[in-house]
Amino acid sequence: MVAVIIKGNEVAEKKRAQLKEEVVKLKEQGIVPGLAVILVGEDPASRSYVKGKEKGCEQVGIYSELIEFPETITEERLLAEIDRLNGDDRINGILVQLPLPKHIEEKAIIERISPEKDVDGFHPISVGRMMTGQDTFLPCTPHGIVELVKETNLDISGKHVVVIGRSNIVGKPVGQLFLNENATVTYCHSKTQNMKELTKLADILIVAVGRPKMVTADYIKEGAVVIDVGVNRLETGKLCGDVDFDNVLDVASYITPVPKGVGPMTITMLLHNTVESAKRAGVVCK
């Protein structure tokens, strides 16, 4: 068996084409989806991520607004800007690019964003709705992962999903999303004592730990679907995931590569959430 490679970039492009069609129909009704991105400081990685989001908006026809502040901005001023955007009918989604400077409390910033414009899915109300299976904006990377698994046409219901990693951004929420799809979910983390025994039970294995090539063939059940969320840069400058891709290729049935696997889906699901927010708001732009 040689695993089928799930090409996240191709899935993302297909979904963006669908979003573009939806945006055209919304604009015919006078509704223009809008995303505001707040960037604090000059971090090159953050700036690169923001550029990707701007490019995605342009690709599907979403209005985007980049608001930049110096690293010295006060928390009070940043909160005031979020208040302004919460009240701006042209803006359907608000995203604050993390990380923020140490003198600003990220929790306070995230909680100030209106849940109706929380297209990142990080607000406690959004998280609570996700936990209870209510309709809400889902966190972008976990949502993208579920969509990639669905591309395999595997029936998730009743399957055993093992998640390696328990971060608030990926590990915890992705397990909850699979639970909402009626999967049986097991979490593994740095304190798990019998990790290989557990991962070898997985029909679907999600790896999100940030350790290059940690997961090898002996972690994986024959025919499992393997989703590699990790992005690590080796000393050679080459990117690799948390899964030893070549080593696992002959054991898994499906696998995502790094790069061009999970990554392209994250921004695509952000665009999806922004379009959904515009539909819900239904505000005609004048």
UniProtKB/Swiss-Prot annotation:
PROSITE patterns: THF_DHG_CYH_2. SUPFAM superfamilies: Aminoacid dehydrogenase-like, N-terminal domain (SSF53223), NAD(P)-binding Rossmann-fold domains (SSF51735). One of its GO terms (molecular function) is methenyltetrahydrofolate cyclohydrolase activity. It catalyses: (6R)-5,10-methylene-5,6,7,8-tetrahydrofolate + NADP(+) = (6R)-5,10-methenyltetrahydrofolate + NADPH; (6R)-5,10-methenyltetrahydrofolate + H2O = (6R)-10-formyltetrahydrofolate + H(+). One of its GO terms (cellular component) is cytosol. Pathway: One-carbon metabolism; tetrahydrofolate interconversion. Belongs to the tetrahydrofolate dehydrogenase/cyclohydrolase family. Homodimer. This is Bifunctional protein FolD. It comes from Bacillus anthracis.
